[in-house]
């Protein structure tokens, strides 16, 4: 086991303080950790003092999300507040490749609707099949025209005396014709 070093407490945390209260703390440079040790979970390999690196703070996910969101918004507004170049005071000037964004109001980005949308007969909650047919080009039933297919009659069950029911000859199947019509139409 290691021996506690000079000024280390019983937990192994280095808590050495300056001798008088008027002396400023010297800035402690943090050395960059070698790339081999970045995957280590040992706090001393992260380049931080053990007392700082081993602090665990319980936080709810919604609180963490809110903090991250506000930090990102703060960074965004801070970035927007800084002039990016000295010629930004010119009207209509922006850096090449920069995206012009509207000033952030109460609602953020406004969604612009197409003309005519959101007015008239548009109702929420209607499915695609339940929407009114008005306004469609071609009227109801617009689409490819295919001739109606006649399904073959179901197989007849033998009568109780073993004879088939007397029916006329079965009509020929029309499925090959319908397929040909569809192909020629397109």
UniProtKB/Swiss-Prot annotation:
Compositional bias per record (Polar residues), positions renumbered to this chain: 13-22
Region (Disordered): 1-42, 89-186
Signal peptide: none
One cellular-component annotation, GO: nucleoplasm
Location of this chain's protein in the cell: Nucleus, Nucleoplasm
Taxonomic superkingdom: Eukaryota
Biased composition (Pro residues): 24-36, 145-157
GO BP field: transposable element silencing by piRNA-mediated DNA methylation
Alphabetic keyword roster: Nucleus
Basic residues composition bias: residue spans: 114-126
Subunit structure: Interacts with SPOCD1.
Function per UniProt: Protein adapter involved in piRNA-directed transposon methylation by connecting PIWIL4-piRNA and DNA methylation machineries. The PIWIL4-piRNA pathway plays a central role during spermatogenesis by directing transposon DNA methylation and silencing, thereby preventing their mobilization, which is essential for the germline integrity.
Record's protein name: piRNA-mediated silencing protein C19orf84
Organism, scientific name: Homo sapiens (Human)
């Amino acid at each position: 086991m290691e021996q506690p070093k000079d000024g280390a407490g019983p937990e192994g945390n280095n808590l050495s303080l300056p001798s008088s209260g008027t002396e400023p703390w010297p800035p402690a440079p943090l050395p960059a950790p070698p790339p081999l040790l970045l995957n280590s979970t040992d706090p001393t390999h992260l380049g931080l003092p053990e007392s700082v690196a081993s602090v665990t703070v319980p936080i709810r996910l919604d609180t963490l999300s809110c903090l991250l969101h506000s930090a990102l918004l703060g960074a965004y507004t801070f970035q927007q507040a800084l002039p990016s170049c000295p010629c930004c005071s010119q009207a209509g000037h922006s850096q090449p490749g920069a995206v012009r964004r509207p000033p952030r109001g109460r609602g953020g980005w406004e969604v612009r609707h197409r003309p005519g949308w959101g007015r008239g007969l548009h109702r929420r909650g209607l499915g695609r099949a339940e929407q009114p047919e008005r306004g469609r080009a071609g009227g109801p039933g617009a689409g490819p025209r295919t001739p109606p297919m006649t399904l073959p009659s179901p197989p007849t069950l033998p009568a109780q005396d073993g004879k088939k029911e007397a029916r006329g000859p079965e009509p020929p199947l029309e499925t090959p014709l319908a397929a040909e019509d569809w192909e020629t139409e397109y």
